[in-house]
Amino acid sequence: MASLDTGAYKDLYHDYASDDQARIEERKLVGGLEGDALYVDATFPASGSSLYYNEHQPPKYGIPAELVEWNRIGGREIEGCVEPVFVSEAPGGGGVKQGALRDRWFLSALGMVGSKPELLSQILVSSALWKKGIYTVKFFKAGKWRYVHVDDKIPCDRGGRPHFARSCDANEAWVMVVEKAFAKLHSCYEAICAGGLEEGLKDCTGA
């Protein structure tokens, strides 16, 4: 991925030495928050720029940015997600449900990874601070594991229904979080609409 190699998206991911370092940095990101304050990811804002290449010209399947509400997982603002958990006791058991985004190639890979707990746990680096609204995920890109921190704001319609992917278990958050982190790694959700299953599996497993 040339743009990643040249650092075009360098502010959107981190080349940490290990998962432990990523968790330390995650704690630093929320360390200054006071009281009930929640993490807000300024590098991938809750706005049209995180949805599309051009927020004023969404693709044909796209939802106008002004109609999107960014709802928090931890705030129980998402339809059906009344008792949110990152991964249920049966990881991947509920399956992956595609939304409006044309990223089936990635979701197919994600569904396969989600059916194997040892693979899923590899990319889900941290949900320890989910109550502060932050998660950390990693993907294998351009020969390295790239770490991505995201907040828990998910693009939804005004009824709280996620526009994009989610788990078939509405309380399970990992699918929404991982898709958002993957979109951030590539600059926006629209950017992950093209790809193949083999590429998606490598991104999620390193193999």
Sequence positions of predicted segments:
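Structured alpha-helical subdomains that flank or immediately precede key functional sites
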Residues: M1-A207
